């Protein structure tokens, strides 16, 4: 049988997702993306038959790369569905494209200010129709990302961060439906947790962490963010919450405008929601979320239980601040192979 080499060119404009992607944060541009060698995406046909999972060979700058595969080529006038990050179990277990399972459990950040773990949880999908021998995909981000900046009041080693409210509104597990381009929760909890791999932070230094959450409307709810150290000490932040939207980056910090640590006498600007942009043009101002209080406590965990987290009311006004651009754009897939 003759091998067919199909080369698929993927043009990136700062998209967030890939299973082996590289991420960086820029205060003016948001989260910037770069492909890594041998990254994978998954592709299905209209009927849900897996065609091929393409291996990515990144270009020098990581923005323009080629997917290559053997034994197939795009079929004219056919619809294709693409998802990322790649999951081999979908094919092994013959899971329908309407019920692809995803999970928000097990998020673990290994180092301070590291974004590496985002690649496994920043779920995206898109669809495209072939015109001639090419197909264009616009991939949609399904989740929100929180950037948490916490000025440590003393030298400590941190083990986890928990975002919590009083009801089971946070998506724990869900399914992706590539045909409807939607996400549906299959189980919910009242919190979402980011594990920290014993990250040591000196007094006065900043712990920077990233957490992925499914879109959720927290408007009017009591919401807390709990930062836990290895000796059981907890710092509980009251957060004025609102709707967390897909494809948005939110910033939570515990410093005021003078850069001082948050205390009972200081309030912190936080949780800026930017709009997705495909250019470097500054975006309009948008409302922000406020950290309204901070409390120190110590919780002695039982050996086999989960932590108990403190809740308190929301007490702050909304204000506006400059947004942070997440650069995103269309992924253009062009079949350059021949039958």
Where are these regions (language model features)?
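Extracellular Ig-like/FN3 beta-sandwich strand-entry sites
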Residues: 75-79, 218-222, 322
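C-terminal outer-membrane/trafficking sorting elements
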Residues: 288-339
């Amino acid at each position: 049988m003759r091998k067919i080499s199909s080369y698929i060119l993927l043009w990136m404009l700062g998209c967030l997702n890939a299973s082996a992607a590289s991420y960086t944060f820029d205060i003016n541009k948001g989260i910037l993306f770069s492909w890594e060698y041998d990254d994978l995406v998954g592709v299905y046909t209209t009927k849900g038959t897996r065609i091929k999972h393409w291996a990515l060979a990144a270009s020098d700058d990581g923005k323009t790369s080629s997917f290559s595969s053997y034994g197939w080529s795009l079929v004219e006038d056919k619809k294709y569905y693409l998802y990322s990050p790649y999951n081999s179990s979908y094919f092994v277990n013959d899971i329908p494209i309407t019920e692809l399972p995803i999970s928000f459990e097990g998020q673990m950040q290994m180092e301070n200010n590291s974004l590496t773990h985002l690649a496994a949880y920043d779920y995206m999908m898109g669809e495209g129709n072939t015109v001639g021998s090419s197909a264009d995909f616009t991939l949609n981000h399904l989740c929100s990302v929180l950037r948490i900046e916490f000025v440590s009041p003393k030298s400590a080693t941190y083990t986890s961060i928990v975002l919590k409210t009083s009801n089971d509104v946070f998506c724990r597990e869900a399914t992706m439906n590539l045909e409807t381009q939607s996400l549906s929760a299959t189980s919910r909890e009242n919190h979402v947790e980011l594990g920290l791999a014993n990250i040591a932070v000196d007094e006065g230094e900043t712990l920077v962490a990233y957490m992925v959450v499914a879109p959720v409307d927290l408007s009017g709810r009591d919401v807390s963010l709990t930062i836990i150290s290895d000796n059981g000490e907890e710092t509980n932040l009251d957060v004025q919450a609102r709707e967390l939207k897909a494809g948005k980056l939110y910033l939570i910090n515990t410093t005021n405008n003078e850069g001082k640590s948050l205390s009972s006498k200081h309030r912190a600007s936080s949780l800026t929601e930017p709009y997705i942009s495909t250019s470097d043009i500054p975006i309009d101002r948008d409302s922000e979320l406020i950290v309204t209080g901070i409390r120190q406590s110590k919780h002695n965990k039982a050996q086999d239980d989960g932590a108990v987290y403190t809740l308190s009311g929301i007490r702050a006004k909304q204000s506006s601040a400059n947004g942070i651009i997440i650069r995103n754009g269309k992924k253009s897939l062009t079949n350059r192979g021949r039958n």
